[in-house]
Curated annotation (Swiss-Prot):
Residues 143-147 are annotated as: Flexible linker. Pfam families: HHH_5, RuvA_C, RuvA_N. The keyword DNA repair applies. It comes from the Bacteria. Residues 64-142 are annotated as: Domain II. The gene is ruvA. This is Holliday junction branch migration complex subunit RuvA. Homotetramer. Forms an RuvA(8)-RuvB(12)-Holliday junction (HJ) complex. HJ DNA is sandwiched between 2 RuvA tetramers; dsDNA enters through RuvA and exits via RuvB. An RuvB hexamer assembles on each DNA strand where it exits the tetramer. Each RuvB hexamer is contacted by two RuvA subunits (via domain III) on 2 adjacent RuvB subunits; this complex drives branch migration. In the full resolvosome a probable DNA-RuvA(4)-RuvB(12)-RuvC(2) complex forms which resolves the HJ. Residues 148-198 are annotated as: Domain III.
Amino acid sequence: MYDYIKGQLTKITAKYIVVEANGLGYMITVANPYSFTDCVNQQVTIYLHQVIREDAQLLFGFHSEEEKDVFLKLISVSGIGPTTALAIVAVDDNRGLVNAIDNSDIKYLMRFPKIGKKTAQQMVLDLAGKFVEAPKEESSKPPKAKQQGNEQLDEAVEALLALGYKATELKKIRAFFEGTSETAEQYIKSALKMLMKG
């Protein structure tokens, strides 16, 4: 098992990033790949969780140990796999998640992709009281230069699809942001907040 990787960030796609360490490029699935935009061709530390399946070995990556801890707690719940847990972690403010679990807010939990009533109830049962503190965003990144809005919006929608959100939900998001000019990361953060409000 791996705990973290230090290396040069060489590539960003809608689903994963690539970190080169000791001459090997590691494909790492992350919640919001575009949150790493400022780190391309720079040294990064990514906290890892490895999943070994019959047909694949997957690496899931996180900005901080706190974010990884939330992910690990989520995948311990019956009915939540790594992809679903990553989609939940992608929501910028995990305090909402912690409050929903501690207050048995099933409706809020059901807003996450692939979380039905039974799984939401299981989350409350298994995780209530297990989060000491909501994860803090570790980085103090400088504001990003704005790029072409439509291209960035396309990348954001592609990343949200990869997290499991439905195309029908994302049509409304796309229409809302059409004509604006933000980075893909900013679109993703704003879209996740909108999706969680319902």
